[in-house]
């Protein structure tokens, strides 16, 4: 069955909920138990991820809202929930007192004593929430690949702390841009483009860029961090992000089937590849409709794909159902 992954994108905004070490300790409330566990937050924050539990019942319900379950009708399995961990996230977390930070991360990621977040999304190189714009190979030549200070000083320490709390966390990664020396203005105009925003990947560098992915996954592995999955490009139809790169479905198909997929296979990487990674509406570009579906229809590309990633910033989430029905 073809998986569909819904990517949660954004900075880790629940940092606003972190505690201060000077606050008085709050009494530990008993954990409610029941058939269903409910976490609820209200606009007024009278409930702030408050945990409750309810039991199934076949009796008439006097409550204003009822949820009726039909066990004979099943849909896709929900693998988990999570958040983006960016350079800015990690920088701010490291400003906290170590005990406060650990308590906060435990509350967020622990299966036993927290909310049990099970996924993390990080960037390969910089993102729109990084401390600076960079890739891991800013000097021309793939032999110059190296993890950068933002990763070594901020992202890796926080990921290691999270993994010490919940070792089963799955990490999904995506680049916002390739190294600038691999960029061109467009595929029609192969003029080099030395700006972080927009541009396209020069096909002449497909193999080097695939090697870049391999080296990045291996570098994190050397730090004890497994990368569960990658996408070839964050928001491939977005020309205007702080760091961005346009990648049509044809480009992504060709990159995956001729470079990224084979390089992962040769390197023996278990890291999965998800297609697309953008909005439900495909930015209203007619030629990009059904972006991942068109990639699935190419057998040479689809053999390397696990599924597709979507963002919730545009269009209708019904597109997930459409894709699942068309490409089960």
Regions picked out by a protein language model, each given a short descriptive name:
Residues 29-59:
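N-terminal zymogen propeptides
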């Amino acid at each position: 069955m073809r998986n569909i992954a819904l990517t949660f994108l954004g900075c880790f905004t629940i940092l606003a909920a972190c505690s201060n070490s000077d606050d008085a300790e709050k009494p530990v409330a008993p954990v409610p138990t029941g058939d269903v566990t409910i976490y609820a937050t209200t606009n007024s924050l009278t409930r702030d991820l408050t945990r409750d539990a309810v039991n199934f019942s076949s009796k008439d319900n006097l409550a204003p809202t009822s949820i009726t379950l039909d066990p004979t009708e099943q849909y896709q399995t929900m693998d988990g929930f999570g958040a983006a961990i960016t350079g800015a996230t990690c920088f701010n977390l490291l400003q906290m007192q170590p005990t406060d930070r650990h308590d906060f991360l435990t509350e967020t990621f622990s299966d036993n004593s927290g909310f049990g977040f099970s996924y993390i999304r990080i960037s390969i190189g910089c993102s729109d929430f990084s401390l600076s714009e960079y890739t891991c190979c800013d000097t021309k030549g793939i032999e110059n690949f190296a993890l950068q200070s933002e990763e070594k000083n901020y992202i890796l320490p926080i990921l290691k702390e999270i993994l010490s709390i919940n070792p089963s966390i799955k990490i999904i990664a995506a680049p916002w841009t390739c190294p600038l020396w691999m960029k061109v203005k467009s595929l029609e105009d192969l003029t080099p483009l030395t700006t972080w925003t927009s541009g396209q990947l020069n096909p002449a560098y497909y193999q080097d860029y695939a090697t870049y992915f391999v080296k990045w996954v291996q570098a994190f592995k050397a730090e004890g961090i497994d990368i569960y999955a990658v996408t070839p490009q964050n928001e491939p139809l977005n020309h205007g992000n702080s760091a961005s790169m346009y990648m049509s479905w044809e480009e992504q198909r060709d990159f995956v089937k001729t470079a990224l997929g084979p390089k992962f296979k040769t390197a023996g990487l278990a890291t999965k590849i998800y297609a697309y990674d953008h909005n439900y509406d495909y930015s209203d570009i007619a030629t990009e409709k059904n972006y991942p579906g068109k990639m699935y229809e190419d057998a040479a590309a689809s053999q390397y794909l696990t599924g597709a990633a979507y963002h919730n910033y545009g269009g209708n989430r019904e597109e997930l159902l459409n894709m699942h029905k068309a490409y089960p």
